[in-house]
Amino acid sequence: TVERNAPDWVAITTAPGQMKDVYLPDSTLVALAGDSWIRYDAKRYDKERRAVEMNGKAFFQVTRNEARPFSVKTSQTEVTVLGTSFQIDEKPTVTEVNVVTGKVCFTAGEEKENVILTAGMSAQYSMENKEITVVTEEDVNKLAWRTGQLRFMESPLDKVIEDLSDYYQVKIANQTKNEGARLTATFNNLPLEDVLQVVNQTLDARLVSTSKK
């Protein structure tokens, strides 16, 4: 009987720098970022519920099915939805959820603290503080690895550096005197050198990429 109930795991893995689109049995789309994995039990998936486990970063576009909620588990958190699109990014100390459409329930920690997030909202769970922080302002750059677009609206230099470092996977040094500078610009699939040139010229700044992260 143990054998019969044993999970039949289907696992999909990506190498660093690789991206992969995966369709689950219910047509839910999972876009895996580099150095990530996802798995589900083929025997049980879409029977009573739709449960997935993951590590790393992934974007989900969930096929709506009110009878069978969809849930994603990371090491410390869980997201449950009916039908929506959202991203989970699990880093060593923080797990972040960004909701693009629909509504999700984000549960975290041993206390099973939970928050409801709607389109445009995001939340972070800190492993250190054991707390969920909710952000109501939408940050489109969190999805730049999927869209190829980086958008800045009156963004301070620190935010620009953080987003560029994350997107291009490099370290960027700020050798700028102009600390209070803010950037308004949109970049579509541009190489880092071009972006840095625009930022430096526009803001009279000096940002230099130093190395791979």
Question: Where is each model-derived feature located?
Answer:
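A residue-level detector for the "anchor" residue at the start of short, highly conserved motifs
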Residues: 1-213
